[in-house]
UniProtKB/Swiss-Prot annotation:
Entry annotated with the keyword Flavoprotein: no
Pfam families: ABC_tran (PF00005)
A biological-process GO annotation: sulfate transmembrane transport
Similarity comment: family membership: Belongs to the ABC transporter superfamily.
Protein name: Uncharacterized ABC transporter ATP-binding protein HI_1474
GO terms, molecular function: ATP binding; ATP hydrolysis activity
Domain ABC transporter: 2-199
Alphabetical list of SMART domains matching this protein: AAA
Keyword presence, Transport: yes
Binding site for ATP: G29, E30, S31, G32, S33, G34, K35, T36
Length: 199
């Protein structure tokens, strides 16, 4: 369970909410409202006041690299000189070939395992980035509009696959999005930010 209490940054003002294990929360709001700042605070990338607890443990005591969280945004950060397999190995060296194949198969890109990022379409690259985020079986998945650069058809295809993976693996998820349809598809629970405040 994630509990955010009186979170404040240079943008956010007294933000409080909670998410149950395996729940998906959508965060909506205009550009500049603090959505990305919220994810950065939870990930441990920026300083803040207030408290963030994960499974009753104060996150301030754990540096970002010790948190089993994965952050995915529009910047895919795929290593261009590594194949799909190579990118997965860098994300989780202990993952077996079978684990890689199963995950890529679920994402419908197992046939691309030996290709390089420049040989993939935008939608395929997004799926590889998802695979890299999920290969470590994260406790918390932070999604910052990762599909906004895709056309609607590609976006909806990925929605279906990702929602199934999240539900099957019971991954707690926070999704930042501008799209009401996307928020509604992924979760029944939403919060809205406006000028750094919950409304």
């Amino acid at each position: 369970m994630l509990i955010v209490q009186n979170l404040q940054t240079n943008i956010l003002k007294s933000i409080s909410f909670s998410i149950e294990k395996s729940e998906c929360l959508s965060v909506v709001g205009e550009s500049g409202s603090g959505k990305t700042t919220l994810l950065n605070a939870i990930a441990g990338y920026i300083d803040y006041s207030g408290s963030i607890l994960w499974n009753n443990q104060v996150l301030e005591n754990n540096p970002p690299w010790k948190r089993n969280f994965r952050y995915l945004n529009q910047r895919l950060y795929l290593f261009p000189h590594k194949t799909v397999r190579g990118n997965l190995i860098l994300a989780n060296p202990s993952a077996s070939d079978a684990e890689q194949q199963i995950l890529l198969s679920e994402l419908k890109i197992d046939h691309l395992i030996n290709r390089y990022p420049h040989q993939l379409s935008g939608g395929e690259q997004q799926r590889v980035a998802l695979a890299r985020a999920l290969i470590y079986r994260p406790d918390l998945l932070l999604l910052d509009e990762p599909f906004s650069s895709l056309d609607w058809s590609s976006r909806k295809d990925i929605w279906k696959v990702l929602k199934n993976l999240i539900q099957t693996n019971e991954i707690t998820t926070i999704l930042v999005t501008h799209e009401p349809k996307e928020a509604e598809y992924f979760s029944g629970k939403q919060i809205q930010l406006y000028q750094g405040q919950l409304i």
